[in-house]
Amino acid sequence: MVMAILTRQSRRKHLRVYNPPQQAAEVRYTPSATNSSAVPPVAVPPKPTADTILGKQYEDVRSVYSFGKELGRGQFGVTYLCTEIASGRQYACKSISKRKLVSKADREDIRREIQIMQHLSGQPNIVEFRGAYEDKSNVHVVMELCAGGELFDRIIAKGHYTERAAATICRAVVNVVNICHFMGVMHRDLKPENFLLATMEENAMLKATDFGLSVFIEEGKMYRDIVGSAYYVAPEVLRRSYGKEIDVWSAGVILYILLSGVPPFWAEIEKGIFDAILHEEIDFESQPWPSISESAKDLVRKMLTRDPKKRLTSAQVLQHQWLREGGEASDKPIDSAVLSRMKQFRAMNKLKKMALKVIASNLNEEEIKGLKQMFMNMDTDNSGTITYEELKAGLAKLGSKLSEAEVKQLMEAADVDGNGSIDYVEFITATMHRHKLERDEHLFKAFQYFDKDNSGFITRDELESALIEHEMGDTSTIREIISEVDTDNDGRINYEEFCAMMRGGMQQPMRLK
């Protein structure tokens, strides 16, 4: 009942932000018919611009902020560094193209995200919302600039790591969950990429930055649309009947990765990941788990309990003896190889996607018949790329009943280079059956692509050069992956090692000995 009240109150509260701003109203003077003096002025409030998303008049965000460099690019828009003209303070501005918000659901998603950001703003570990603006072409969301970078990047750069450090990070993540749930919000997409550090300082605060899939909790409602990211999704999401408990599961997956460097459930394809989430036992046997404290493992188990009714609540997690400030988390360094595994986990998918893309670009017409026509049918403007809108429309024509969120996830998975559209090779890579892509002749062509000098080996320089050319990873990360693939330790990757990397799972080559 408390949640329902909070939700209703928060919705009423949010709607105020979209009222017409308190600016000078138009003043109309009506001359008197019998008197030369004017009657008192009648204020006529400005009318909201027709067909707005935010329900208020258009405003020029550039009259308040000056825009600088691009910080990132996503499916619906671009994030820029911006500076408040009056104060000189720097913020981030996400500019969302209205042209890409083609459906009523798209527009409602943006409204809801802004409402939730404003509702949660000012709370610890949550990015501060500054304001929302709308003009003819875009919706602009101005928020706190988190200049400290991604969570995992900071951990890896630091080079040493303890259970206590993992507990501090996990406490911040679970605190976000606790705040969201207390304030009537379910996040639905907790993952490390959605957390940034506020500054470059050593003890910078961790901030949750993305609420695009979040919803206001409706008491008694069971949610059914599949949302989230594969490694972090809770089993009840896959069963299409879930509530806010899913956020604790996702936080538990993050904790498992913080302690071991890899996710608890993995596979080469999404279906395999989902099967593991539903049925497999959590691995506490392989390294580094024997050296991790029993208290830490106890918390992971209780956060990753498959029955949501038996899973700890966010408030209970914060009270766990391992997680509490000054609690049982050890200050003894965790094996440094965990950092290496964490780095590989972040980059391995990019490496394999790159190789698969090379293979897809070399498939012959016979192997891709049907897929080429499907691509052309979806590419309605003949641009050579498929936009989100075209993908959604094309899937609908094929009889797909995927939700908006599921189509967005398909788009993100297929869009390897992250430019917001799917090119022909990306489409083939995503739709071709994996066993065809992994046939010997295709793997050999991919091997030859990297083996520029036809020496029969891929050197570190060759693979680094190819991956940097396609902006798929940084040099240090690539070196570590090559070291893992190079099982005979001769400093090069031969064809057998390359095939093993492509066909094998992520977990086995990344296990600590």
Swiss-Prot record:
- Coiled-coil-forming residues are none
**UniProt: Ca(2+) 4 binding residues:** 486, 488, 490, 492, 497
UniProt: Ca(2+) 3 binding residues: 451, 453, 455, 462
Q: Which CDD domains match?
A: STKc_CAMK (cd05117)
Q: Which UniProt keywords apply?
A: ATP-binding, Calcium, Kinase, Metal-binding, Nucleotide-binding, Phosphoprotein, Repeat, Serine/threonine-protein kinase, Transferase
Known Gene3D superfamilies for this protein? EF-hand, Phosphorylase Kinase, domain 1, Transferase(Phosphotransferase) domain 1
> What molecular function terms (GO) are annotated for this protein?
ATP binding; calcium ion binding; calcium-dependent protein serine/threonine kinase activity; calcium/calmodulin-dependent protein kinase activity; calmodulin binding; protein serine kinase activity
Q: Where are the stretches annotated Autoinhibitory domain?
A: 329-359
| Chain ranges of the EF-hand domain | 366-401, 402-437, 438-473, 478-508
List positions binding Ca(2+) 1.
Answer: 379, 381, 383, 385, 390
Q: Name one GO cellular component term.
A: nucleus
Where does the Protein kinase domain lie?
65-323
The superkingdom of the source organism is: Eukaryota
- UniProt-listed GO biological process terms: intracellular signal transduction
Q: What SUPFAM superfamilies does the entry give?
A: EF-hand, Protein kinase-like (PK-like)
Residues noted as binding ATP in the record, renumbered to the chain: 71-79, 94
Q: Which residues form the active site?
A: 189 (proton acceptor)
| A Pfam family that the UniProt record links to this protein | Pkinase
Sites binding Ca(2+) 2 sit at 415, 417, 419, 421, 426
Q: Which reaction(s) does the protein catalyse, per the Swiss-Prot or TrEMBL entry?
A: L-seryl-[protein] + ATP = O-phospho-L-seryl-[protein] + ADP + H(+); L-threonyl-[protein] + ATP = O-phospho-L-threonyl-[protein] + ADP + H(+)
E.C. number(s) listed in UniProt: 2.7.11.1
| Activity regulation description | Activated by calcium. Autophosphorylation may play an important role in the regulation of the kinase activity.
Return the similarity comment.
Answer: Belongs to the protein kinase superfamily. Ser/Thr protein kinase family. CDPK subfamily.
Function, please? Answer: May play a role in signal transduction pathways that involve calcium as a second messenger.
Q: What is known of its domains?
A: There are 3 contiguous domains conserved in the CDPK subfamily: a kinase domain, an autoinhibitory (junction) domain and a calmodulin-like domain. The autoinhibitory domain (329-359) inactivates kinase activity under calcium-free conditions.
**Name recorded for this polypeptide:** Calcium-dependent protein kinase 2
Supply the source organism for this entry: Zea mays (Maize)
What phylogenetic lineage does the species belong to? Eukaryota, Viridiplantae, Streptophyta, Embryophyta, Tracheophyta
